[in-house]
Curated annotation (Swiss-Prot):
It is found in: Cytoplasm. GO terms for cellular component: cytosol. Mg(2+) binds at residues 225, 246. Its main location: cytoplasm. This is tRNA modification GTPase MnmE. Exhibits a very high intrinsic GTPase hydrolysis rate. Involved in the addition of a carboxymethylaminomethyl (cmnm) group at the wobble position (U34) of certain tRNAs, forming tRNA-cmnm(5)s(2)U34. GTP binds at residues 221-226, 240-246, 265-268.
Length: 441
């Protein structure tokens, strides 16, 4: 049985309107007491005054929702007050004094899940929508809110359940029904491969959600920090004519064509005896290993140098874009690289061409990532365990093991899928998911 909770659902601060929710068995009684409304129609907006202990609190709009037709599945009230901090707090205080308690983080959405209004995947999608920092992330999360991933998981469940039912029929009628092990092997092999592809696409999906890591590398004074500042549209890095100014890794975030990128500016790579600069260079080399795409910045006024050759050896085999910078100052180079881009980080010349090149370089990540609807690490880890159980079932079938061993593998895979969508769950799991939400959601 749920108790009655309340919280401000809109962001803290001053605005035109604030939203306060009350959920639970006492919610309607509390609202009627504060408004003086007795007979109400559900899901209709009323404009009235809130009164408490003889004082007018605010003129508000209020909506009554009747269980189960609400966000939570319980009796629910939404009050729209004027958006001042004080007036909002006064209204909330009156609600709490009238019999509600303050809601915990994500408790409204958690109640919706527990009442079957949404799946666990949809609950996670709501959080991802709120936290989305790029158009691509938002679109993926909205697809999950519509139930896209849930449909895919139900398909996996259905295939496994079909095989299990075939196996269990042979347990009940061993002399009458012969199991078609070849057909089951083909089906499970196909399903295992589908889950494997989903996992690979999902890792790219999470990469898109978290931001594709783009590392800027180059020799000292090639204009890396100027390029970082130009891409970020702010002076994040110190820019001077003195080589080796950047000693540490500097990070920022941008969006290009709806794709989120985490940009990493690194210390200039060269041979040096300076102890501090050496540490910065070591960190630069580590960032190169983490990069999804590398901007290899070269100086058009000096051409391709020994230092550039040293850096090229470090990044060869990686997903890099050769970027000739300072093209407004010099043209001291011949075409050396395929796909090289000419820019001036100082005045922005060629920047659009560079952005287009960056997007094309990560095209595979974008296409695979947006094809997947898995957007959390929890979901990926569960699918990896599902894959392991399916792989075990296929191997056991191939080696001619008893069919009841295959049944155990499939039941374990099924349990994992149930955990993914929330058919089965633990209190710790729910606390871990919903504690990330804000109070009021």
């Amino acid at each position: 049985m749920f108790d009655t909770i309340a919280a401000v659902s809109s962001p803290h601060g001053t605005g035109a309107i604030a939203v306060i929710r009350i959920d639970g068995p006492k919610s309607h009684d509390i609202a009627k007491k504060l408004t003086g409304l007795n007979k109400v129609e559900y899901r209709r907006v009323y404009t009235t005054y809130l009164n408490f202990e003889g004082d007018i609190l605010d003129q508000v709009n209020i909506v009554f929702f009747k269980s189960p037709n609400s966000y939570t599945g319980n009796d629910l009230i939404e009050i729209y007050t004027h958006g001042g901090i004080l007036v909002t707090q006064n209204v909330l205080d009156a609600i709490l004094k009238s019999g509600a308690r303050i809601a915990k983080r994500g408790e409204f959405t958690k109640r919706g899940f527990l009442n079957g209004k949404i799946s666990l995947v949809q609950a996670e999608a709501i959080y991802q929508i709120i936290e989305a920092k790029s158009e691509v992330s938002l679109k993926m999360s909205l697809q999950n809110l519509k139930g896209k991933l849930g449909e895919e998981i139900e398909y996996y469940r259905g295939e496994i359940l079909n095989v299990l039912s075939e196996i269990e029929v042979t347990f009940d009628y061993p002399d009458d029904i012969e199991l078609d092990e070849k057909s089951i092997l083909n089906l499970l092999s196909k399903l295992k491969d589908e889950v494997g592809r989903k996992i690979e696409d999902s890792k790219k999906s999470i990469m898109l959600n978290n931001g594709i890591v783009m590392t800027i590398v180059g020799k000292p004074n090639s204009g890396k920090s100027t390029l970082l500042n130009r891409l970020l549209l702010e002076d994040r890095a110190i820019v001077t004519d003195i080589p080796g100014t950047t000693r540490d890794v500097i990070k920022g975030e941008i969006e290009i064509n709806g794709i989120r990128f985490v940009i990493v500016d690194t210390a200039g790579i060269r041979e040096t005896k300076d102890v501090v600069e050496k540490i910065g260079i070591e960190r630069s080399l580590k960032e190169i290993q983490k990069a999804d795409v590398i901007l290899f910045v070269l100086d058009a006024t000096t051409g391709f140098t020994k230092e550039d050759k040293l850096i090229l050896r470090k990044i060869e085999g990686g997903n890099y874009i050769p970027v000739w910078n300072k093209c407004d100052e010099g043209n001291n180079f011949n075409k050396i690289f395929d796909g090289e881009i000419k820019i001036s980080a100082l005045n922005g010349e060629g920047l659009k061409n560079l952005e287009n090149k960056i997007v094309s370089k990560v095209k595979n990540i974008i296409e695979s990532g947006t094809a997947s609807h898995v957007i959390t690490q929890r979901q990926v880890e569960i699918l990896e365990r599902v894959y392991t159980h399916l792989e075990s079932a296929v191997n056991n079938l191939n080696m001619g093991y008893e069919i009841d061993l295959i049944s155990i593998d499939l039941r374990r895979a099924l349990e994992e899928l149930d955990m993914l969508i929330g058919r089965k769950f633990s209190d710790d799991l729910l606390d871990n998911i919903f504690s990330n939400f804000c109070v009021g959601k």
